[in-house]
């Protein structure tokens, strides 16, 4: 997810200390959990930290609290966002509509963003290639904003260290803007439609693209897109409906 990351302090505080072991440790933990859940093969091997990326052990002790806090803010933001989506689901259930509602939850539009570079109190510093060290930013943070409690608040546009982005891309290499690696381009999709999709707890391995969403919705609604609109010939839709995989986890992929 790109920045800036803003969240109420109490949400970030829920993750106090959770990331003090650094981004390599988080990437490894995520990788092992993905194995346990069946998302990746049991014999998969974790890639090492990408060349040129700063190792957690090389982050000065005086800066590690700052770097950890940026990830706590991000985690709090994610949980808060999920909670709001949950309210929509709860309302659908309360109205008796959830059973026959198709929900498509796409996690993001790309891989995790490394645009925060070395961790920043202002994402624009990194985006505009304005030279500044973490030490300089911490000095400004203390002098002008009152210290760490300002992180995640409305006066700053914080963005976490690229190491956290790399950890979030597990099990793949790369991050947002790196089109050559799956870590920059792949993102999970969760589907829910209780009336039509039998829950089997199995991950769907078929490869699909965001341009498959519209054909899926048309398919579900039994709609054939018009070939002509006001005398203008329409370009055929790219994409393939996902419905073939709804109740057959091992179905042959409809696209290659």
Segments (PLM) and residue ranges:
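Outer-membrane beta-barrel transmembrane strands
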Residues: 73-88
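Histidine-centered active-site microenvironments of extracellular/periplasmic hydrolases
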Residues: 4-9, 93-193
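Active-site His/acidic residue clusters
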Residues: 1-25, 29, 47-73, 107-126, ...
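Alpha-helix capping and helix-loop boundary segments enriched in small/acidic/polar residues
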Residues: 18-25, 58-61, 65, 72-76, ...
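C-terminal cap/loop subdomain of S1 sulfatases and analogous C-terminal strand-loop tails that border
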Residues: 154-182, 196-206, 210-256
């Amino acid at each position: 997810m790109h920045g800036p990351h803003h969240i109420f302090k109490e949400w970030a505080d829920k993750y106090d200390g959770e990331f003090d072991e650094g981004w390599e440790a988080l990437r490894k933990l995520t990788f092992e959990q993905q194995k346990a859940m069946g998302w990746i093969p049991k014999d998969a091997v974790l890639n090492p930290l990408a060349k040129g990326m700063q190792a957690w052990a090389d982050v000065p002790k005086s800066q590690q609290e700052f770097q950890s806090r940026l990830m706590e803010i991000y985690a709090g933001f994610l949980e808060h966002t999920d909670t709001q989506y949950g309210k929509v689901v709860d309302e659908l259930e309360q109205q008796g509509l959830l059973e026959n509602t198709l929900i498509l939850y796409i996690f993001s539009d790309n891989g995790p963003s490394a645009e925060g570079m070395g961790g920043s109190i202002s994402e624009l510093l990194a985006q505009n290639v304005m030279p500044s060290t973490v030490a300089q930013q911490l000095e400004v943070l203390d002098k002008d904003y009152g210290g760490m409690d300002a992180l995640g608040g409305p006066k700053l546009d914080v963005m976490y260290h690229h190491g956290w982005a790399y950890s979030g891309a597990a099990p793949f290499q790369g991050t947002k803007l790196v089109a050559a690696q799956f870590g920059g381009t792949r993102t999970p999709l969760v589907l829910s439609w209780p009336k039509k999709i039998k829950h089997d707890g199995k991950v769907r391995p078929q490869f699909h693209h965001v341009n498959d969403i519209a054909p899926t919705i048309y398919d579900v609604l039994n709609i054939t897109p018009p070939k002509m609109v006001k005398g203008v010939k329409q370009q055929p839709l790219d994409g393939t409906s996902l419905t073939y995989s709804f109740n057959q986890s091992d179905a042959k992929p409809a696209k290659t």
